[in-house]
Design a protein with these regions (language model features):
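Short amphipathic alpha-helical segments with coiled-coil-like heptad repeat character
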Residues: 1-2, 136
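Bacterial N-terminal signal peptides that target proteins for export
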Residues: 2-11
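Bacterial N-terminal signal peptides
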Residues: 10-19
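Residues within mature, well-folded domains
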Residues: 22-215
Length: 215
């Protein structure tokens, strides 16, 4: 069953004002252009510029820094958004994710495929066949891969709509995490679905993809 508890440390809640655009637009980067454990924070900053937000937290005592980039458009009803995040430990990339609700590159996925994934049996190759290409990948130490030797594939999607004559924004976010051991066999799966409704307000810090650990 999907969990509906708050995510750690941030839940995506896109808050806009009027017809403003928030952030500079960007396209989906090619995952092959990143190498986990090797790509540096300096390279990401040079490539994408100043992030919308930046946070730091500890995973098993190890400091992980996350850079987040966001772009949104305020429309009549739907409020499409793109976000991407990059996590680093000691200056090297340990994870990245991309989320979009724009029609051109939306990252919707079928969470029902989770029912066919078996812990201790399903391989990463089989999981990719069932769910498709992930929006993000993480290695230890990160919020999705919290033990040495583990890696995780992440699937993220968010949809926002204006309610109450445009005075309220309702956002529904889905994040599926599939963690693998050193043999690329599934050890954990975690599906989180959250819905939030907030007054429209320009708050860039809330436009960040969620980073929740496995439970």
């Amino acid at each position: 069953m999907p969990s509906r508890r708050p995510l750690r440390p941030a839940v995506l809640a896109v808050l806009l004002a009027g017809a403003c655009l928030l952030g500079a637009d960007f396209g989906r980067p090619d995952p092959a252009s990143f190498t986990l454990g090797q790509t540096t924070e300096a390279e990401i900053r040079a490539r994408f510029g100043k992030p919308t937000g930046e946070t730091a937290a500890r995973v098993g005592g190890k400091l992980v820094t996350t850079l987040r980039y966001a772009y949104a458009e305020a429309r009549t009803v739907a409020v499409p958004v793109r976000t991407m995040s990059y996590a680093f430990h000691e200056g090297h990339l340990v994870g990245f994710d991309y989320m979009s609700s724009f029609n051109a590159d939306q990252t919707a996925f079928d969470e029902l495929a989770l029912k066919r994934i078996k812990r201790g049996e399903t391989t990463r190759t089989e999981a990719l066949e069932l769910v498709g290409k992930p929006t993000g990948q993480y290695i230890y130490p990160s919020f999705y891969a919290t033990a040495p030797g583990r890696r995780a594939d992440v699937y993220s999607h968010s949809q926002s709509e204006k309610l109450s004559a445009g005075a309220t924004l309702e956002t529904t976010t889905k994040v599926l995490t599939i963690a693998f051991d050193e043999h690329d066999v599934v050890v954990e799966t975690h599906l989180v679905i959250t819905t939030s409704a907030k007054p429209l307000k320009l708050t860039p810090d809330t436009m960040h993809p969620p980073h929740g650990g496995l439970s």
